[in-house]
From Swiss-Prot:
This is Membrane protein insertase YidC. Gene3D superfamilies: 2.70.98.90. The chain crosses the membrane at residues 6-26, 339-359, 410-430, 490-510. It comes from the Bacteria. CDD domains: 5TM_YidC_Alb3, EcYidC-like_peri. Keywords: Cell inner membrane, Cell membrane, Chaperone, Membrane, Protein transport, Transmembrane, Transmembrane helix, Transport. It comes from Solidesulfovibrio magneticus (strain ATCC 700980 / DSM 13731 / RS-1) (Desulfovibrio magneticus). One of its GO terms (cellular component) is plasma membrane.
Length: 532
């Protein structure tokens, strides 16, 4: 039957979607000499110089001992080292490592990442946090929501004065920087600037649904670079980038400069993901100054916070081809959550709403399937009679459909319309940080064992995937069997294949699919009872 072929196509499409990164990895780029986030000199390219501001004078500079500056806000606690302005800690107050109440806060800059000098600036191949004398203005900052505070750092390297003004906000995860280079020498300077971030792995190494990856965004859109082996060799996209980041489905650490003509590169070294954006040909005339505005984002991938950053940082939430479907579904999910206060229940309500919207189409599909079921004996006879003449068999089948006024695609079209909705919801749930550590049923009934306490994690006891497989099997039994024996055998194994595939799915996705199956069974059963 035609509708069976579509069911099979949907199932295989899901398998391709889930295993896309494994089946079709991005084309491997050959490593380039400058691919690694390194500290090597490279020839600078000239570009038209902007009108120069007055240089910071050497007389105004006086080195001070390095110190650790703590910035405390309602959203995070950060520790900045005044020697070069590198981060040593960035703990998110609203997010913990696990679901346990006493679990440590998510710290985007741990000891491993700290060793790679996140937010450090490399000037002409020289790390400024190592080879520059620094002074600092200001101390610890305690910021309330709506407030902002600035740390001013200045460094001297020969005739050059480097100045970093880092502004922290109490209600965003963005660090705004005003960077300047002053030339007190007698000749113009051409510089190469590297802006860097470094972060430890943001997700488990074996989590294929939530990988830690390098991300770059430019005129051609989002460029994702994943795979430890590939990143260990270093990657360097050829096109200019507007921002670069290390991210998972839920968190992002990135650089968003005001200029949009920087070159990106990324490397995995010593278990730490490093991303840099290079600015070539930064000219500073004699006695002049060159300025650059930069934004750094360190935080959760929540749209309202990402939208505060320039250059479409919100594009880091990548729903793929079904973006136009996923976004409204996420809004509906949040709408239901605002009323029920439980994302598991919100997923169920959203699933019911989707089924109600497509109810008329589903009814039409079931009706068409029933008509096709009645024709199965006649179709079987035609297949047997014209098994050696496929063209004649198809002609006779079309005549049979015409005689009984049956559209063989009638059961397929309603299902095809629903495919974008399913894939859109799949992507929406997979990339929604709201489901991270969001509980549905905290404990297994009648026990103290934790169950479905985190909708972004798999079912620890595999109960929901097994029930989901059983519902698929039941639904299959309620559907007319295909006339093609090979197709029938494939369909017989689909519940088993789906069950194994869903074993490691985030439980929120399994809940959606399970509820969808249960409603479909109820709808089909209602149709059968109505007919009888």
């Amino acid at each position: 039957m035609e509708n069976k072929r579509v069911i099979l196509a949907v199932a295989l499409s899901l398998a391709v979607l889930v295993g896309w990164n494994f089946l079709f990895p991005p084309a491997k780029q050959a490593p380039k000499p400058d691919a690694a986030v390194s500290q090597q000199d490279a020839p600078a390219q000239s570009s038209p110089a902007a009108p120069a501001a007055k240089a910071e004078t050497l007389a105004a500079f006086a080195p001070t001992p390095g110190k650790r500056i703590t910035i405390d806000t309602p959203l995070y606690t950060a520790v900045l080292n005044s020697t070069g302005g590198v981060l040593e800690q960035f703990a998110l107050k609203n997010y913990r490592e696990t679901i346990k109440p006493d679990s440590p806060l998510v710290n985007l800059i741990d000891d491993k990442a700290k060793a790679k000098a996140p937010l450090g600036i490399i000037l002409n191949g020289s790390p400024t946090w190592q080879n520059v004398d620094w002074s600092a203005e200001g101390g610890d900052l305690k910021l309330e929501a709506g407030a902002a505070g600035t740390v001013v750092l200045a460094g001297r390297m020969g005739d050059v004065v480097v100045k970093r003004e880092l502004t922290f906000s109490g209600d965003s995860y963005i660090i705004d920087e005003k960077f300047s280079l002053s030339n007190n020498g007698g000749a113009p300077l051409r510089n190469r600037l590297s802006l860097t971030v470094a972060v430890d792995r943001l997700s488990a190494a074996d989590d294929s649904y939530n990988p830690t990856q390098a991300a770059f965004y430019g005129a051609s859109g989002l460029d994702l670079e994943s795979g430890d082996k590939k990143l260990a060799e270093g990657v360097a996209p050829e096109k200019p980038m507007e921002w670069g980041a290390v991210m998972s489905n839920y968190f992002l650490v990135g650089i968003v400069p005001e200029a949009a003509d920087l070159r990106g590169k990324a490397k995995l070294e010593d278990g730490v993901f490093r991303v840099a954006l290079d600015k070539d040909g930064l000219e500073v005339p004699a006695g002049g100054r060159s300025d650059l505005s930069i934004a750094y984002f360190l935080g959760p991938k929540v749209p309202k916070y990402l939208e505060m950053a320039p250059h479409k940082l919100v594009a880091s939430i990548d729903y793929g081809w079904f973006d136009f479907v996923a976004k409204p579904l996420i809004k509906l999910l949040h709408f239901f959550y605002d009323y029920v206060g439980n994302y598991g229940v919100a997923i169920i309500l959203l699933t019911i709403l989707i089924k109600l919207i497509f109810w008329p189409l589903s009814q039409k599909s079931y009706k068409s399937m029933d008509q096709m079921k009645k024709l199965q004996p006649l179709l079987t006879q035609l297949r047997e009679k014209y098994k050696d003449d496929r063209q004649k068999m198809n002609e006779e089948m079309m005549q049979l459909y015409k005689t009984y006024k049956v559209n063989p695609a009638g059961g397929c079209l309603p299902m095809i319309v629903q495919i974008p909705v399913f894939f859109g919801l799949y992507q929406a749930l997979l990339h929604s940080i709201e489901l991270r550590h969001a509980s549905f049923i905290t404990h297994l009934p009648f026990t103290n064992m934790i169950w479905l306490a985190d909708l972004s994690a798999k079912d620890p006891f595999y109960i929901t995937p097994l029930i989901m497989g059983a519902t698929m099997f039941l639904q299959q039994k309620m559907t007319p069997a295909p006339g093609d024996p090979t197709q029938a055998k494939v369909m017989l194994f689909m519940p088993v294949i789906f069950t194994f595939m869903f074993l490691n799915f985030p439980s929120g996705l399994v809940v959606y699919w399970l509820v969808n199956n249960v409603i479909s069974i109820a709808q089909q059963g209602w149709m059968l009872n109505k007919k009888s």
